[in-house]
Regions:
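N-terminal leader/auxiliary helical segments
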Residues: 1-93, 97-258
Length: 258
């Protein structure tokens, strides 16, 4: 999972070039599209201090190929076509497109021992924000859904119920709010408290000293990001055709989320 900002940024950029009908649907159900941009990552935030069956769904679905994930979802949506589901579908496609391109490199860099997976993604998020000239990005507001919308999302993930989606999003939004606090004593206290329960969130809250360690990794990741953007229009076309008349998904959907 490139981190939250990278996925939000990528999806927002890709939305402008999507076919007009897809763009209208995404804008009409923008909350679902925005949450779709985070893909299965939301389950990592379900009661993260302990291992749970729901929390493990994040890893389970990241091990699926694009063909597995999107074929199953499209079969489901054809049985009960709903525009809300399509909005989430295309958000999730954005998530997959970026994950599938970036994760192999992130795993390689992590194995080389410079920094771990989460640290690399955290530093890359900050790099992108600096590239965009942003110092104060509020993403928690994009992580809220109504109860019926949680029901839409749960259809994408066998084993999850609407209540699980709701609690996962609440956890994700709370973590984001903590990470969005300005540098100072309050942020230090809150992030240290979060880090007590999870190494992952401790890495997400790492200070700017991490940026220097990961600086040399950002450019190769940015190249993967740009390649994902270049390949995305073809993925949109293929997914639309697959949903509409079960056209086969190509090799672009062979990689796993990672």
């Amino acid at each position: 999972m490139p981190a939250t900002y990278a996925h939000y940024r990528f999806g927002t950029q890709m939305l402008t070039g999507m076919p007009a009908d897809v763009r209208r649907t995404a804008k009409r159900y923008r909350r679902l599209f925005d949450v779709g941009l985070q893909g299965p990552d939301l389950f990592f935030y379900y009661r993260p201090v302990v291992s749970t069956k729901i929390g493990r769904l994040g890893s389970k679905f990241h091990r699926q190929t694009g063909k597995e994930f999107f074929s199953r979802i499209c079969r489901n949506l054809r049985l009960e076509p709903r525009e809300e589901g399509l909005a989430y579908l295309y958000g999730a496609l954005c998530h997959y497109a970026l994950d599938a391109k970036c994760h192999p490199l992130i795993e390689k860099l992590s194995r080389e021992g410079i920094a771990n997976h989460i640290q690399i993604e955290t530093a890359f998020d900050r790099f992108l924000m600096e590239l965009d000239g942003k110092t104060d990005v509020r993403l928690a507001k994009h992580l809220t859904l109504t109860d019926p919308e949680c029901g839409v999302v749960s259809r994408f993930y066998p084993g999850a119920e609407p209540k699980h989606v709701r609690e996962s999003l609440k956890g994700m939004a709370n973590i984001r709010r903590a990470l969005e606090l300005p540098e100072g004593p309050m942020r230090t206290m809150v992030t240290k408290t979060i880090g007590l329960g999870s190494r992952t969130f401790r890495d997400m809250a790492a200070g700017k000293e991490l940026d220097a360690v990961c600086r040399e990794l950002n450019q190769p990741l940015l190249e993967r990001y740009r390649q994902a953007a270049k390949d995305f229009p073809e993925q949109v076309i293929q997914l639309g055709a697959h949903f509409a008349y079960n056209a086969p998904l190509g090799e672009e959907f062979t990689p796993i989320f990672g």
